[in-house]
Amino acid sequence: MTKEEIKRLVDEVKTDVIAWRRHLHAHPELSFQEEKTAQFVYETLQSFGHLELSRPTKTSVMARLIGQQPGRVVAIRADMDALPIQEENTFEFASKNPGVMHACGHDGHTAMLLGTAKIFSQLRDDIRGEIRFLFQHAEELFPGGAEEMVQAGVMDGVDVVIGTHLWSPLERGKIGIVYGPMMAAPDRFFIRIIGKGGHGAMPHQTIDAIAIGAQVVTNLQHIVSRYVDPLEPLVLSVTQFVAGTAHNVLPGEVEIQGTVRTFDETLRRTVPQWMERIVKGITEAHGASYEFRFDYGYRPVINYDEGDPRHGGNGVRAVRRRGSGPLETEHGRRRFLRLFAKSARQLFLRRRGQCRKRHRLPAPPPALYD
């Protein structure tokens, strides 16, 4: 199979990919509810032939293409779920499901992987090893559907896993990549400060949970600035502080939530210990009590490093020839194949969709790409 023949197959599938993307965009489904989406993907894959299909979970799909010769096992993954956003567009393939929209490009990811599966199914005689096409459900919810799929065995025996995400800030025709650490582990924390409520005019009869919570928030910031080497990437953000229902009443409790982003596994396991030590010390000093919970999300995305002598195969060299641009390392804006890649090498790319303008994130509501 020559490059010209492959290009011909790519050109031939282009119309299908656009049609699939528009169908998916018009019929978005939320995380763990992707039943019609999964059925559409399954039936579309079934029409290609040569693929062994399965449903690892209720709303996910896996297709296996077994080559004619032995070789490595490569997995390619796309996400399928939409977001709880009301679409404001008026074009014919705008969302038909009120309050649900493909606002993050998962319709495009799914359509592209369908197109990839169709092309490879026509190249079966030239394939060595196995290709697994993984259509993941529930990427948007914490900790996501990847864990269920891994537990179902979709990654058993996989050597390399590949994924991509549409990224509007990129120039058209460019592929963005970071070798080594690319996206951080997105963990979250929950803190409840339990004091003693009372009238706002008699604070001496209370244990002021708001004042205690404010001290906790302030002191948590010292973890990044004073506990960790300045060259070590770490983000700790308090994103919610909930307390009280009346202007003249001091509440008995405060709830604090937020996120922690890390690349280093040792630091990742140490940060919650530091956090709880701070919370414990402050609450005990003021006669309050606390609850602390730290939920671990996906592992960090660490692309197989280009400096590794085992890396830099034909696929990566082809990407470079086509035109790739560096991306800044990110603290986990996207939750990708961290669980999928736990036991396999990974390569995660970004590419721009065919949108009319380059946008900085967060992306605007219009989904102007195909």
UniProtKB/Swiss-Prot annotation:
SUPFAM superfamilies xrefs = Bacterial exopeptidase dimerisation domain, Zn-dependent exopeptidases
Give GO terms: molecular function aspect only.
aminoacylase activity
Pfam families per record:
M20_dimer (PF07687), Peptidase_M20 (PF01546)
Q: What Gene3D superfamilies does this protein map onto?
A: 3.30.70.360, Zn peptidases
Catalytic activity annotation: an N-acyl-L-amino acid + H2O = an L-alpha-amino acid + a carboxylate; an N-acetyl-L-cysteine-S-conjugate + H2O = an S-substituted L-cysteine + acetate
Record-annotated disulphide pairs: none
EC numbers listed for it are 3.5.1.14
Q: Which InterPro entries match?
A: Amidohydrolase (IPR017439), Bact_exopeptidase_dim_dom (IPR036264), Peptidase_M20 (IPR002933), Peptidase_M20_dimer (IPR011650)
Assigned keywords, A-Z: Cobalt, Hydrolase
Requisite cofactors:
Co(2+)
Q: What class of enzyme is it?
A: hydrolase
| Keyword presence, Hydrolase | yes
Q: Which family does it belong to?
A: Belongs to the peptidase M20 family.
What binding partners and quaternary form does the record give?
Answer: Homotetramer.
> What is the role of this chain?
Hydrolyzes most efficiently N-acetyl derivatives of aromatic amino acids but is also active on other amino acids. L-stereospecific.
Q: Sorted alphabetically, which PANTHER family does this protein's record hold? A: METALLOPEPTIDASE, PUTATIVE (AFU_ORTHOLOGUE AFUA_6G09600)-RELATED (PTHR11014:SF63), PEPTIDASE M20 FAMILY MEMBER (PTHR11014)
What protein name is recorded for this chain? N-acyl-L-amino acid amidohydrolase
What species is given as this protein's source?
Answer: Geobacillus stearothermophilus
What lineage does the source organism belong to?
Bacteria, Bacillati, Bacillota, Bacilli, Bacillales
